[in-house]
Amino acid sequence: MRSTKTESLELIKALSEAKAPSGFEDASIAVAGEFAETFAAVEEDHLRNLYVTPKKSQNSDKPVFMLDAHGDEVGMMIHSITPKGTLHFLTLGRWDPNTLPASKVMVHTKFNTWIPGIIAAKPVHFMTEEEKGKPLNIADLVIDVGAVSYEDAVENFGVRIGEPAVSAVDFSYDEQHDIMFGKGFDCRIRSEEHTSELQSLV
């Protein structure tokens, strides 16, 4: 039986709010797997691919076809920590640097927690005229988590080089206009669609 609209929205919300940038897809894979294991055989390989097979199709001699979707999202990875405790980052996926300043993000830590941060750029009133006329580069941006030194960022906030970060966006649904707001819709909407389609075959 296919999921109801309410059930689909709940799954989309869970998938959208999973913090799973490219290379760190564990959370979104877990959400999809937990939903699917109620009606299907679920397997995961060493490359973190998740295979969902309706139980009644496991030993069938009928043709097999694949419904494919990916579970990651664009994100960031911390590549250095400044003496003042701010974090330089690389992008995982494509971002327009000019849209990022003042965005809230969540940064993963060595304590296996996520802490909030704000993407900051050099204030306009500190820029030279030449700087004001140039587009921003990722190298011009830092994430501020509130740390006041390198040691503070590492020891107290638990930040490490190589930790991922994602946009801090909660899922919401405008029932009146039937519109969803969130992050990671590409391609997690497809993940929901595929698992619901497979569920309907049971």
Regions found by a protein language model. Give the residues of each.
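N-terminal hydrophobic/helix-forming segments and targeting peptides
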Residues: 1-192, 196, 200
